Curated annotation (Swiss-Prot):
One of its GO terms (cellular component) is cytoplasm. SUPFAM superfamilies: Aspartate/ornithine carbamoyltransferase (SSF53671). Pfam families: OTCace, OTCace_N. Carbamoyl phosphate binds at residues 52-55, 79, 103, 130-133, 261-262, 289. The gene is argF. Pathway: Amino-acid biosynthesis; L-arginine biosynthesis; L-arginine from L-ornithine and carbamoyl phosphate: step 1/3. Keywords: Amino-acid biosynthesis, Arginine biosynthesis, Cytoplasm, Transferase. Belongs to the aspartate/ornithine carbamoyltransferase superfamily. OTCase family. GO terms for molecular function: amino acid binding; ornithine carbamoyltransferase activity. Gene3D superfamilies: Aspartate/ornithine carbamoyltransferase. Its EC number is 2.1.3.3. Reversibly catalyzes the transfer of the carbamoyl group from carbamoyl phosphate (CP) to the N(epsilon) atom of ornithine (ORN) to produce L-citrulline. It comes from Methanosarcina barkeri (strain Fusaro / DSM 804). L-ornithine binds at residues 161, 221, 225-226. This is Ornithine carbamoyltransferase.
Amino acid sequence: MKKDVLSITDLSKEEIYELLESAMDLKEKRKAGEPTEYLKNKSLGMIFEKASTRTRVSFEVAMTDFGGHSLYLNSRDIQIGRGETIEDTARTLSGYLHGIMARVMSHETVEKLAKYSTIPVINALSDREHPCQILGDFMTIMEYKDKFEDLKFAWVGDGNNVCNSALLGSAIVGMEFAVACPKGYEPKPEFLEKAKSLGGKFTVTDDPKVAVKDADIIYTDVWVSMGDEAEQEKRLKEFATFQVNTELLGVAKPDVIVMHCLPARRGLEITDEVMDGPNSVIFEEAENRLHAQKALILKLMK
């Protein structure tokens, strides 16, 4: 039976641990130059409604490493962008491909793709969640901290799609989660309620120093995401005191790791000093997107 991953909650704690173990193994094999052609003659269709650097390159490289093939399907270049229904697109692509990855504006799009396709569908970013990002993040945390339990994960900034997945993922693996957002930018109540139902321990505050106090992980993201450009001026004012800088790091544990899903707006949500400093694991985190997604593709498509 096919499995889709549209939310981090589509994976159990056990499945997350299995994926991270697989990702670390695949990372070692890649560094050693070992062949991993596990998906020879298999094809992954990649539907993009939003521009991307890390998502596109990492998924394409993943399929190349596996001896398979990836097809970049920009929504402007296929009929889905000219009025063909998502339902018909899903059914058609199911006859050609072995998996679909979709980076979309609306979460409803990936839900429909999953419902009407007979092949696995991966959410590579929607307006609600970004499970692939969190798998790469959790791999990075495991590499640096070797555990999830007894860790405090502090999110500073917008309670956006990545924050939603981080909140829910932390609840699944047993990390304490603290989010600091300006009033009105908190994660939506449905995500907080879901985290609670998963046994999550979390706090929501509008004071970054409260969230970051004794944190093991500090995470930030852009203040103005794709689609929010009309609010740029307003957001830059409201988020001005939510910058991850040296002063804020001083409130966390000395061995805190700093994370960012990228792309970053240096000088806004994070300073150069922190991004390029000794606590930053941001570029290892970016690399781990590749390995974590390889593990996920392999689980769903092998």
